[in-house]
Amino acid sequence: NIQVTELLGDRDMNNLIKSNLKRYSDSNKAKLFKVKINSTINKRSLAKDTTGKTTDYRIEVTYNFKIDNEKLSKEINITETFDYKSIEDVIEFIKYENTVKQNIANIASQKLISQIMRIE
């Protein structure tokens, strides 16, 4: 049973992780893991064309998870990085960037669940 107790940092990335962890919240399970999430997101330009317009980006998301249960307290840090090219169509670019963020949150969630399973 995983319960998110605190969210700090980037709201969107935290909500994506929280949404992924909801499927692991079952009040019938005996073990309760309380999770505090702190996230930071950094998007930067990797390359530019001759006009100075960014053509390649790198997005880096760092999560700091503090996990508490009746036996122990543990801190887990997960950093995910993804490089991608710019898209001319602004709407398509925003959609693509949101998909990238969702994928990063999915990977980080899976890594967190894997770490929690080892605690049990």
Task: Please name every model-derived segment.
Residues 19, 23-24, 28-77, 81-102, ...:
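Surface-exposed short loop/turn segments
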Residues 108-119:
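Short, low-complexity, Pro/Ser/Thr/Gly-rich segments in the mature regions of secreted, periplasmic
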Residues 1-30, 119:
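A structural "domain/chain start" motif
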